[in-house]
Amino acid sequence: MSKLITCIWFAGNNGEEAAQYYIDTFNSAPDDHSAKIGDQTKAPKASEEVSGRPEGSVLTAECELDGISFMLLNGGPMEQFKLNGGTSFIIECETQEEIDYFWEKLSAVPEAEQCGWCTDKYGVTWQVVPRILDEIMRLS
């Protein structure tokens, strides 16, 4: 059986750091959230020129956040892979406490972001929303 995995390109070569940050954030969250670290791959000599990562350093770090698999790639600074708000990850929250927690952890500029959308210190965009938002939208 095939498996869908989201790969996020980190131009700043900080994918390993981001993976650990997300693991810590989700595992410390109130209510029912979970995260775990997965495998890492090391950079081969051939990737050194593109990524700027020395041979043997971490090229990819895998993690699972609330059951969803991610591969965080230390790909190097390539403009066509720059992160933007066109892709976001939705975190459905049961309580205001959860919303406030994720907003505080994942919003790099809280006063500049609104309507549940925030961008973290790594450039990844998140939507932190109440779990019942879809139902509310359908009923309006």
Residue ranges with predicted function:
Residues S2-L4:
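Extreme N-terminal starter segment of soluble prokaryotic enzymes
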Residues T6, V58, E113-C115:
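Short loop/turn microsegments at loop-to-beta-strand junctions
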Residues I8-G67:
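Core segments of cupin and vicinal oxygen chelate
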Residues T25, E64-S69, N74-G76, Q80-T125, ...:
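Vicinal oxygen chelate
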Residues A46, D134-S140:
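A short, polar/charged loop-to-alpha-helix boundary motif
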